[in-house]
Amino acid sequence: MMSSAVWQRSKAAAARARILGSRIGSIILILLWSSPGPALDCPAVSRTFNPANLALAAVTAFFLLFPLTLGKPGLPTHLKADEGAYYLAAQSLAFDRDLRVEPKDVDRAFQEFPFGPVNNMIVMTDDGWHTVYFAKPYIYSLLGAPFARLFGANGMLFFNMPMTMAMVWMGYLYLRRYNPPGLAALFSASFFLLSVGFSYVFWIQPEVFNMFSVAACLFFGLPRADETGLPDRRRELLLAFLSGAVLALAVYNKPMFAAVGLAPLYAHLRDRRWKTLGVWMLGAIVSMGAIAGIAVKLTGHPSAYLGVQRQGVTLCEPGKVPITPEIVKARMGGGGGGDEDGAKPSSVPNSTTGNTWTWLLRSVDVTPYEEAENIGYFLVGRHTGMLVYTPFAALALIFFLLRGRRRAGELWVLLGSVTVVGLYFLTFIAWNWQGGGGFVGNRYFITAIPAFLFLVQEIRPPRLLLAGYVVAGLFLAPLLFTPFGAPVPEPTLQAHVRGIPFRFLPLELSLRNVPGYERVSIDGLRIVGRKDVFAPQGAQMWVGGGTQVELYFIGEHPIPRAVFQVTNFAPGNHVEIRMGKAREVLDFGGEETRRVSLDPGEPFRVRRQKWATFYVYRMVVTSRTGSVKHWVRQYPPNNCPTFVQDDRTNENFFTGVALAYLGAGAQLDADLYEVQWGNTVAPPRVRAGEAFAVTTRLFNQSRFPWTADGAARVNLAYHWLDAGGKQIVEDGLRTPMPWPVPPGERVSVQQKVLAPPAPGSYILELDPVFETVAWFSQKNGGKTLRIPVEVLPGGSDAR
């Protein structure tokens, strides 16, 4: 009898183990073909075959194999954002079992990504750069290291894919408790695959890893309403331990996500399951302790990211660590700031808390207006809006409010927790809450998105799912079908927002690091436009032809009136300019210039920040056609001479019109042309075609200042006359005023002049010009300064 009882208990224990193995196995995607039991609400579901399981298994198989087929080197061509540190750390752990940055680690980067330097790889030291470590939180790299060893960079993407599909399965198993299996599978797959989160599968960064940690925490930790009576005690404790332990993985990367754990903790506290609560806490502590302990073993610190000296560096060539004590000493001493090849580590911007452990305790530096503005962007922003980039998370919230609001207090705690996490980002890093310069959607908050699925109980009415597919089709398709970036002019991670639907969403003007935009300052205004359709050229602003171009004018004062000089290049062009309530329509026959005056009325937006108030005006320029214009793109100095880079390249731009902002227009009618010439010195003889300088001194005898900036400014210029006084060169080189010249003041300028190409006797006629308006001589009766100059043949002695 005793042996029989023992056998029965062993059999029961084995059965419980099989059930637990089934749940855990679904997370790691060991797909079980045993038929599951039916959902509570669906007694008619077949016990022998479940099409939902087969569908998810097929989708899982496809996505699991896809990352392994990517050709290397080539797809993608380079490491972006923080990928360099995470991937090379995984390689170092896989092959060297350490996190030290050594020449062999640099070699590995160029084996798969040989087409350019690896930028902004974050490293750290605690001994003056004698020993260098990878400085990103290491746990993602550690767990992905076996896959990186087997498959290289593709292995890290493969590592991301099982976690993504595990989230789909967890969502399916959770939703099946309350819904038919087919509907549960459809919603879960749509939630995770039709989301910007799926784009991060193709990033060698921990976003998917963190999402998986949050999803697994809630899957294991929330009460299971499909179970009758009290669950098996040991099973309950094991699930609680796993819930706390797996959340620690995300918390190590981003501590604020510890708030997600409040939901299961509340449920255990409410039900007075003190032991379960304690085991949950124990799981979190043990997991975090193990993670920190391994970090100490590898780097000497609980975190390689905090409490250390941290730096961003560029990998320029194989076999060479780009930062050493000698390089740092040279930089600190002003000795060049780079190694012998010019590779200069770029400093990582520090917050007010630097790299210390107190970085979570920043001071609040945001006004209520900015907070409200950021909340709006957070929900529907063009680059970050949650409702746009994760449409099924929005549907999950709707289903929760419709069907789940009276059922479980822990779900309200969960909603409050993720809300607090979102508000933390918006409040304490109000200028960078989207995730820095390398992001799609909201990279920081994407970790919390799986929590929204666990708010759902009944998916009713199911027809609401169609809204999610409509939003995904309009806004996510361009992003999801180009996971490695789109081949577009002016390539950027944000290229997807150039589609028509995104025009109706607000641009996040509060964020500093949104790539893909030109930002120029003209006449006290900051003007922002997309790089592919906006090309500032000095005082002129070229806007793209055959399309609609959106520009933002941002200044500290309202703009009651805006005057523009509009230059058309294409014959038969039809141009419409809208700014606020003002609208101008221009029809051009050919190349010509016109002046338009716009009264925009109320600003598009008033941004009330802590230190200033900014007035924002939105302009939309639509050109029917355009003309190809040429310009020269200049590049910053090449810090990686191993890779050849041109200092400048010739570029093409399909230009609709060129705009020159002339201010409010009041100064355009100012009589500022009275001038008195001072002692001006010019060489009596110059060589043909030679550029030379004239020391020009003049007094402003008018009642108005001579402006030195903006399109309508005063420049020094000249004409060339022949010996008989006939003008042979009208528009000479421009020399800007060094500063605004008030009435009655004198200015002395080294004026640039270019000699005529042919030898002979000439007269240099100095004549200031009020740009876009008139030459001074046209308004003051011809008060120019004429200087005889002998132009000698090229190569002659011009002394």
Regions found by a protein language model. Give the residues of each.
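Signature aromatic-anchored transmembrane alpha helix within multi-pass, membrane-resident enzymes
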Residues: 23, 29, 39, 52-60, ...
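Hydrophobic, aromatic-rich transmembrane alpha-helices
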Residues: 37, 168, 265-266, 387-411, ...
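Membrane-interface alpha helices of multi-pass inner-membrane proteins
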Residues: 90, 187-188, 192, 220, ...
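Interfacial juxtamembrane loops and adjacent helix segments
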Residues: 95-140, 144-148, 309-370
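Transmembrane-helix motifs of polytopic, lipid-linked glycan transferases
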Residues: 155-180, 216-220
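Transmembrane-helix signature of polytopic, membrane-embedded enzymes
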Residues: 169-196, 211-212, 231-235
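Specific aromatic-rich, kink-prone transmembrane helix
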Residues: 170-173, 209-230, 239-247, 264, ...
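Perimembrane helix-loop-helix junctions
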Residues: 223-230, 259-285, 289-293, 399-408
